Amino acid sequence: IKYFQNLKDSYKDKIHIHIGVEQGLMRSVADRVNSYDSAKQLDFIIGSSHLVYGEDPYYPEFWEKRSAKDTVLTYYESILDNLSCCHNFDVYGHLDYIARYIPANSYSYDWHDFNDLICIILKTIIEKGKGIEINTAGLKYGMPEPNPCLDIVKMYHDLGGEIITVGSDAHEVKFFAYRFDVVADMLKNAGFNYYTIFNERKPEFIRL
């Protein structure tokens, strides 16, 4: 982090550099997540689900223990569990992340199948004063929508959610800010007039 702090100081008269991290949220690491020292001059912490009770949906064997639909249900239940014990984050990242990895010909994912649970998740995020991320990597992977899908983004807005950040999960420079050009219209269609950035862990709202 010191490296980025030095960059921030060196270029402060030219560009704004914000320093952030992504924390994987899970009950088994909740103490570590909650004790992470945000006094290290971080601007932003994304909390995300990459594992489901310690198992990775990226791998095919993850899907062999139960039906695909039940597996997705377990994923969303794990998010609610994470929210009950992990508190040191600003937005929840790529909320329907698991949709990227559902095996072909196993289950045609429909978020409506989990509508009530997703609604509870979004209400909990809002009540905790957190936000969500709209992540364009879904488009990079050939999905028709970002993560989460726009219906979930709209539900979040309609429930009173205001904090929404934009991320690309680039991993490679060529995917930096991938398809950000279309995100503004997506957010407007979902009811938002602003997107959010964070400075010293405080949200700042930027008009679309």
Show which residues each predicted segment covers.
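A metal-dependent hydrolase metal-coordination microenvironment
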Residues: 1-77, 173-175
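A cross-domain feature marking catalytic cores of carbohydrate-active enzymes
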Residues: 19-25, 49, 93-95, 134-136, ...
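Residues that form or immediately flank small-molecule/cofactor binding pockets and catalytic motifs
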Residues: 22, 97, 200-202
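Divalent metal-binding pocket/active-site signature
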Residues: 40-125, 131-146
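Charged catalytic cores and adjacent phosphate/nucleic-acid-binding surfaces used
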Residues: 53, 105-208
